[in-house]
Structure formats: structure tokens, C-alpha cells
């Protein structure tokens, strides 16, 4: 049985724009609920090996908990304009230095103090299986140069794929790095630890980070390290090993350098939960 969240718990006016909850359905056993506040993935319903449904995306049951940043600010959201950390919030373009607001240990994380995760997005088109969203980030919003026109499509397919497509255009040179910050538990969101999930990542190397989680620029092989997931590994089996990178990340909080193939969109990771029999495969055209 699928217990969809009540849309009325998400209906609210935020900064003069209406926030709501939207549902897309594959028609074949995958139902996804999202809100236009930060394009948050609120729930993903799918069956286990016995046909029992559970919500495998970690999320909140009402909009106020997202607005109040209870717990994890980026829960299920789009992140940007720039995902991950920018050291000291500074970068140079064409000999001009830009300084961004600092919101994470003296760094800029996931777009700054009020990134794309806290913006109310326009809903441009809705069908049973897809939703098109857009947002115009004005020049100098959170310190970033250029007006950024962003379009994002969330869709599901009859093959039970959940797809996210990003598109962004700008009117002057800028930096942009969009991603999604969904959290998954294939036992169901109240299923407890995910350390017994089995993970595979098609990557030979990672980018090292320092103690503030800023990439050092060094790319190192995963050979002989707790970061080697080229063959299926139980997530928790090596997470407590003595390793500087695990210490810096308080576990796994890293970028894997994905293998390139002829195919633009390729399988880069899979996650399997033996108890439920749920398998999630991840495809991308991105490098990490």
C-alpha cells in the first residue's frame, strides 16, 4: 500500500510565491513526490521483493520542517548555484575576484546562505509522468556573477526510472555546478542504518579532500583503500578503518572520478538492499 503525503501539508505562500507538492507516477510501481521549494524530492515509493511498498527517500511530512531547516538543510533538494564547497568562498573569472557569503566553516557550501534549495521554483508544465521547473537567479545572487536561467525536468518512466535533467544558460562568464541532494534508504526511510546496503561504484579514483572537505586537487587511485567499490561492498564493512580520508569526511563524503565510456549516459553505481531485494542503479553523463 502506498501512503502518499497529503498535498495540503505543503501548500503555503513563501516570499509571495505558492509552494505545493506534486506527484508523478510511472504507472508501473514507482511514485515520486516533489515540492517546488528547492525542487525537493520528498518521497519515492517502490515495492520490495514481496510487493510491499515503502518510501525509500528520506524526507519530511510537511513544508514547515523544510522551511525551518530542521536537521539537514539540503534534504532532497537541488543544490546550487554551485554544489559542494568553494574554498574561502572565492574564485576568479577574467582577472576579477568574486567573494561569496561563507556558510560552512569559512567556506561556501552548496550555493551559500540562500541557495537554490531555498528558492520557490516556477512550475512550467505538469503531466502524469513529468514536471518542468524553472528559476531565474539574478546577477550577483549569493555573490555569483551573471543572470542564470535554470530549467530542471523531473520525470519517471514505465521502466521505473527517475530522471533529472538540468539546463542552465547565463549572460556572462560564471561558475555553475548543479546537483540533487536526495537521501536514500532502500529498506524504507524509517528502516534504520544503511551500513548493510551493498554498494558498487564504477570509479578507479577519488579526489582527495583536506580536513575542511575542500578538494586538494589531487586524484588518487582507490586501489587498496576503503574507497574501492569497483566490486560490490557492504557500505559499513570498512567505514571505521583507520584512514585519513575517512577521518576528514567523517566517513564517505567524497567525489569518485567516474570511468568514461563511449556511451554519454552510463551506469556508474548501484545500491542493493538484501532484506527488501530493492536495487537502485545510478546513471549519469557527468564526470563525478
Feature-to-residue mapping (PLM):
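An exposed, glycine/acidic-rich loop-and-rim segment of catalytic or binding clefts
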Residues: 2-32, 36-288
Amino acid at each position: 500500500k502506498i501512503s502518499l503525503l497529503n498535498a495540503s501539508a505543503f501548500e503555503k505562500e513563501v516570499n509571495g510565491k505558492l509552494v505545493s507538492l506534486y506527484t508523478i507516477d510511472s504507472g508501473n510501481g514507482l511514485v515520486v513526490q516533489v515540492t517546488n521549494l528547492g525542487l525537493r524530492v520528498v518521497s519515492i515509493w517502490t515495492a520490495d521483493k514481496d510487493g510491499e511498498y515503502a518510501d525509500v527517500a528520506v524526507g519530511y511530512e510537511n513544508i514547515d520542517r523544510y522551511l525551518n531547516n530542521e536537521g539537514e538543510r539540503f534534504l532532497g533538494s537541488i543544490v546550487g548555484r554551485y554544489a559542494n564547497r568553494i574554498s574561502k568562498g572565492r574564485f576568479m573569472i577574467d582577472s576579477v575576484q568574486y567573494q561569496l557569503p561563507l556558510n560552512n566553516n569559512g567556506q561556501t557550501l552548496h550555493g551559500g546562505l540562500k541557495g537554490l534549495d531555498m528558492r520557490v521554483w516556477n512550475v512550467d508544465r505538469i503531466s502524469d509522468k513529468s514536471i518542468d521547473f524553472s528559476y531565474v537567479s539574478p546577477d550577483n545572487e549569493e555573490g555569483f556573477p551573471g543572470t542564470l536561467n535554470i530549467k530542471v525536468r523531473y520525470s519517471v518512466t514505465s521502466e521505473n526510472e527517475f530522471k533529472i535533467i538540468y539546463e542552465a544558460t547565463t549572460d556572462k562568464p560564471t561558475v555553475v555546478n548543479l546537483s540533487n541532494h536526495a537521501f536514500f534508504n532502500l529498506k524504507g526511510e524509517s528502516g534504520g542504518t544503511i551500513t548493510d546496503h551493498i554498494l558498487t561504484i564504477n570509479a578507479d579514483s577519488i579526489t582527495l579532500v583536506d580536513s575542511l572537505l575542500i578538494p586538494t586537487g589531487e586524484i588518487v587511485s582507490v586501489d587498496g583503500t576503503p574507497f574501492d567499490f569497483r566490486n560490490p561492498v557492504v557500505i559499513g564493512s570498512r567505514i571505521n578503518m583507520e584512514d585519513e580520508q575517512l577521518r576528514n569526511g567523517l566517513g564517505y563524503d567524497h567525489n569518485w572520478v567516474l570511468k568514461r565510456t563511449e556511451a554519454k549516459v552510463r551506469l556508474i553505481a548501484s545500491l542493493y538492499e538484501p532484506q527488501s531485494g530493492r536495487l537502485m542503479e545510478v546513471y549519469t553523463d557527468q564526470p563525478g
